[in-house]
Amino acid sequence: MVNRIISFIASILLSVATTAQTDCYYTKYFNDKALVEKAEKWKAETQAWGGVFTKAKPHASVNATDFYLQYQKNKEEWDKLFKWLQETDLLTVPKGKMKLEDTEITISVEDSRNEPLEKRKTESHHHNCDFMIVVKGIERFGHLDHFSCTTKGQWKPDVIRYDYDKSKTRFYDSTPNEFLIFFPDDWHIAKIANDTKDQEIRVIVAKVRYCP
């Protein structure tokens, strides 16, 4: 009898957890199961996408299927980005913006500081992916739930802001051994203060064209 009660309670808790997950939407959904499984395997195999790039791996939050499809559609530019990241001393390269040679990619090298959440702006992009790798320090990100967000203003020119529900936002910290990619369906907040004393960071941000 006790075991039945425990099993019943467990099933209720699982049902609640599943419902809570389906009540939120954080990244683009793909219903092709075979494609999703292929993309997850591909994402885990650095040589499949990174070539010579060995400095970092994709963060768990990176949408594997979006990454896989974008890489196939724009392989030459992604390869040039990873080559530049591997061959460049990311700690000493001068800060500022630059155009990656023979590409449409814009790279920003930023010496910056994390701030309290209430001071940070939300954003998403329509025409570009945000590739981000923190090379010094720890950067906290927020991943926004679409269902509880409302837009603020208009696109300017490829950025839009949101009002959001903090309780439904996913937060995670990024370190120099991993990178993040925010595709158009990944609404996000960057440079949020983490739980450490040191909020100084150096981050590389690359704007890569999103191919429909």
What are these regions (language model features)?
Residues 1-7:
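Bacterial N-terminal signal peptides that target proteins for export
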Residues 5, 19-130, 134, 138-212:
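Jelly-roll (double-stranded beta-helix
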Residues 7-17:
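Bacterial N-terminal signal peptides
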